[in-house]
């Protein structure tokens, strides 16, 4: 994967906050100046060698440049402590990525779109709502709200877990998050939780996902199966009306059997904007990243971006 990425899109950097972010820019094969571009914001713990390159390549094939990047503290970007998922800093990184694209000589600053998946979906909604220059937004199974937007009932049913075991597991995770926050205040080494693993010790615990995460570790050399536990104390919350403030058209692509993100909650949010489109696909949260379902979703997203960014009469 690393060699293929280097061939498709050489490594570059852009400044962000107190450091920089590593990134790769996928260009259409018939690259020219004044290209539209989509900035891809990966999900929880995600690095730019996992999930996002596949979507970026499809968008480049459709004539749209695509920027993938590593948030600070993850992957090839600097930042200590490592494996820190900080919502505020990640949104700062996303804004820095947009600024980089607007300055790039090959890209059209008036045709910058955002794409976000899972946690990245929350980032792109918040950033686009405050930036009227964003031309289009794609939200792929967006984790907009860690409480109201979580599909708790479906997750309980899938795990065969009652509310009491869930409460005990949640308390263990909360204790880890609080301890990690205390350690962070004293610049001590983080208390890590696994991204995928056993209940009470990891964020994702569904045994059906084991093969997905084994494949991630094998195919994405910079991804790590751990995150600083303090993330739980700042997981995203959606403020009603945010989507209604967004000037850009937005496409929501959802999985109808998603036990992580509530499709019903996302449909309610989408109703805030008359420029929203919602499409649902069979499968779970991670199914839309793989196989035939991925091809269908990526094709629909590329068609939406082409319709908005390559509209007749616009320069290409």
Annotate each language-model stretch with its function.
Residues 44-57, 71:
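The serine-hydrolase catalytic nucleophile loop
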Residues 259-265:
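Conserved alpha/beta-hydrolase "acid-adjacent" motif
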Residues 284-298:
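Catalytic histidine-centered segment of alpha/beta-hydrolase-like enzymes
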